[in-house]
Amino acid sequence: MRRRNDPECTAPIKKQKKRVAELALNLSAASGDEPPSSVNHAAKASTTSLSGSDSETEGKQHGSDSFDDAFKADSLVEGTSSRYSMYNSVSQKLMAKMGFREGEGLGKYSQGRKDIVEASNQKGRRGLGLTLQGFDQELNVDWRDEPEPSACEQVSWFPECTTEIPDTQEMSDWMVVGKRKMVIEDETEFCGEELLHSVLQCKSVFDVLDGDEMRRARTRANPYEMIRGVFFLNRAAMKMANMDFVFDRMFTNPRDSCGKPLVKDREAELLYFADVCAGPGGFSEYVLWRKKWHAKGFGMTLKGPNDFKLEDFYSASSELFEPYYGEGGIDGDGDITRPENITAFRNFVLDNTDRKGVHFLMADGGFSVEGQENLQEILSKQLLLCQFLMALSVVRTGGHFICKTFDLFTPFSAGLIYLLYCCFERVCLFKPITSRPANSERYVVCKGLKVGIDDVRDYLFAVNIKLNQLHNTDSDVSLVVPLEVIKGDHEFTDYMIRSNESHCSLQIKALAKIHAFVQDTTLSEPRQAEIRKECLRLWGIPDQARVAPSSSDPKSKFFELIQGTEIDIFSYKPTLLTSKTLEKIRPVLDYRCMVSGSEQKFLIGLGKSQIYTWDGRQSDRWVKLDLKTELPRDTLLSVEIVHELKGEGKAQRKISAIHILDVLVLNGSDVREQHFNQRIQLAEKFVKAVSKPSRPDMNPIRVKEVYRLEEMEKIFVRLEMKIIKGSSGTPKLSYTGRDDRHFVPTGLYIVRTVNEPWTMGFSKSFKRKFFYNKKTKISTFDLPADSIAPFHICYYGRLFWEWGDGIRVHDSQKPQDPDKLSKEDVLSFIQTHSA
């Protein structure tokens, strides 16, 4: 037996180690870091030794056969003409060692595989080996010549309509009922046939593709995808932000024909808007974020999973938005296709906008058409009509309308657009960059509702009734405007065709791009982040994350809102008005007065029903208000909680209401430095914004009626003796407010609104009031800035005339106590010193 360390035994082991070392050298030489020349050189240098090692292992001497084999292996390694030359020398030599010859398979009889194993074409989570018939073919669309992504957008309006608004007689035979049609391929009146078929074909290609795979490719392909929803509820909010900017803020800052704003933050009128078919409410969240408490929204959408999600309004105060679901109010179903819902919503909006209507209406209706994407226009025709009808029902004269549409190929859709074209000053079809380019979505934007559109509204109302009657039948309304009428307006028709064809071309390229991005997962849009920043900057949207508002305790929020103001001010009590202090109300023109119904308190709103009150004493705590009401966060008011009464006798109803005496901070807006009259005006505006007429179960919020002191007599006219429940049938003094509710008055607050050293007087020669500075002796009719008494001056200097026992302010009361200040004394003093 040979030992392990015998020379003959160890020789093969040494040779094997030598071959491993040579192989390592070759691997090093063939690494990707070396240039091709060094790899080839290393391969040449090692070929002979590799062949020799193999021959020694096999126990063969160098002969002609082994030389030929080595030569062939060498040729395989070095052959640049070989289709295998792309592989490094080591892999080629290993194949040569196994007897590989180009064009032949491995094995004794060359029976092995001759072709290289293809790289995997696996796409995402598809089944292994699955190919999607019809999708993997080429679309033959060059999408690479699309315009460079940009934040700048152009608007193209329809020409101004010169045709008169059609009347009832003219439209009497316009509606055409025909056989229900469920094909779109032949709708070529307002789009070229080739383009129409191309876009439908491109859409159909995606029918077999998995939704997730499509969405991933779309996300990478869309240069505007990263804009998303920023800090808003959803992407819809950013669409509205996008279009509001493009259309020169015509929604959040509407202007008249001269360019002057129709509503101003400092003035009393709110910006009224409506949002229909709009759950969960992204459009409204944007408007309320932009306008804050200077806007009031009304909403109607289908109840259910896609209802308004007001609790998710993180960036705006949902207390300024009032959902109303048509017939039945808050208990309705919100179905806009039901005529009774349209009528109920119209009446509700008009009742709460002084019969004027809203400044603008937004509509973003849509529903799932999965599996029938090409028929979306036909399936949603009634929804589109009802949204247009709602605009003509609730938008005020001069107001605006924006509504989502889809494809507009059919004469039915074109007819609806034509009616808007007749009823508004200007109309356009617009696709914002925040709307994904591959979908059929775009918006019809209408500016300036004309006078005299009632007949068109009534006509569309009748068409909707007919559509409801034809449900589940083979018939349908196919036309709302005759084709010859539409085509008779050449400018309108040309615009429709141009818009449709331009939109089709955009869609085709976008769909082809997504198709390419599905097939090649390495493709991506490099400028998404850059475009996002540019758009947000241009639209005035802060680049912030969406986070829920932080909660706070009332005391901390109070100190945050008053911003270092001396807290002792809030503990001041009013000076009692008596015979001794009557002189304090001179000059009379400097003062205003309000009827009191209970103790004054400070009220803070932290959002929704998180409302607390405090009596002003530092030793006392903020107490949760036990009333059913809602206020926007960051609100601080001076109020009374008053028990209001309606009716008399057994039918008398009692309700607790919040009466505002003065305002400090409104939804984060500090108004303490403004004039008292301005603060009261803003308070009334604020109350309109937060009031919920659809919710009679909620406790009301009202602003105290303010009287000029020289007109105090008007207050006594509103006083009467009434029997109040629980008063043993004894009539009590009652004050009746503007809303026909009455309460038991406790006295009169008298507030000075002019700051020292200024005072007010009346010019007999000019018949008007003026301001006079007691120090400088300057007189002026204009309001001097330093004459405005801020909140703390008004609060500190107020007086209170208590109407307790012995004070006779109504003829039916007990006789006046001669030791107390009488009504006659006060009125006489006012009359004497107001002349």
From Swiss-Prot:
Residues 57-68 have a biased composition (Basic and acidic residues). The modification Phosphoserine is found at S28, S31, S53, S66, S91. A motif (Bipartite nuclear localization signal) lies at residues 2-19. It is found in: Nucleus. SMART domains: G_patch, WW. Residues 231-450 form the RrmJ-type SAM-dependent 2'-O-MTase domain. Residues 37-54 have a biased composition (Polar residues). One of its GO terms (molecular function) is nucleic acid binding. One of its GO terms (biological process) is mRNA processing. Disulfide bonds: none annotated. The modification N6-acetyllysine is found at K108. Keywords: Acetylation, Methyltransferase, mRNA capping, mRNA processing, Nucleus, Phosphoprotein, S-adenosyl-L-methionine, Transferase. Substrate binds at K203, S204, V205, F206, D207, R218, N374, L375, Q376, N439. Residues 727-835 are annotated as: Interaction with POLR2A. One of its GO terms (cellular component) is nucleus. The active site is at K239, D364, K404. This is Cap-specific mRNA (nucleoside-2'-O-)-methyltransferase 1.
